[in-house]
Amino acid sequence: MLHNLRNEPSKPECRMRTLAIGDIHGCSKALRTLLDAVKPGRDDVLVTLGDYVDRGPDSKGVLDMLIGLETTTNLKPLLGNHEILFLDALNRRIDPEGWLRVGGAETIHSYSPDEPTLAWDKVSPQHVEFLSERCVRYFEDEKNLFVHANANAYFSLNDQSDDWLFWTRFDDSYPHISGKRMICGHTAQKSGWPNVKPHAICLDTWVYGQGWLTCMDVEAGIFVQANQAGAVRDFTLEELADPPTHNTVAIKLPAAPGS
């Protein structure tokens, strides 16, 4: 049986945490709820695994929040394939129509919700700079490899191709030659639960598709999730070994208006 939601999940006193957040996809309500639950501090390393934009309703709001986090925590923002598509479409390196069909229309609309047509000129230059200059291809610590999509098991992160880092599905993951665990997103887990293998964990839990946005306290092995409705739940890595169900997880619902 999973235990009740913790008031401040996985935050022992005086311990720097490494936190990893899966694909956000424009779901700013879920991100705000998750940040309120996890409370990343200045000493915490917060790795966001990419795909901040597209599909969900508020990519602009998500990017505003991420830029704000740069001043309040040690943010390590990774680039995802949807950021690559966004930048390529803005710079006309690809036909924008292809990007618009995979969630780009929602992104542009978030910058100009009252416009009857897509207003490309409303996209924030600050957001473009953040994505193109400050988002990185990968992050690595002593025990873990953080990538958006996947990594070729036989190459260092510095030698990975774009195809592996941004486009290869989690199904094709294998133990890395470094012996480190890989933590990634990209491949939506429509069950709503992280996909855990002995050598890798996928944290994309389909928040834009009525799933959850997941944050993992990497060292403690604790997961906290939030959704667009404002609900929160948490569980441990050990509990995932015995697959949980919606009936065995304590879910904290948002307070009713006026309560």
Give a label for each model feature:
Residues 23, 51, 66, 80-81, ...:
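Divalent metal-coordination and catalytic microenvironments
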Residues 120-192:
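His/acidic metal-ligating clusters that form di-metal
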Residues 17-25, 144-150, 201-203:
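Active-site-proximal beta-strand elements of phosphoester/diester hydrolases
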Residues 20, 46-48, 77-78, 145, ...:
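Residue-level marker for buried hydrophobic side chains located in beta-strands
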Residues 25-29, 54-57, 83-87, 139, ...:
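Active-site environment of divalent metal-dependent phosphoester hydrolases
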Residues 55-136, 168-172:
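Active-site neighborhood of divalent metal-dependent phosphoester bond hydrolases
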Residues 1-63:
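N-terminal active-site segment of His-dependent metallophosphoesterases
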Residues 13, 174-259:
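Acidic, His/Gly-rich catalytic cores of divalent-metal-dependent hydrolytic chemistry
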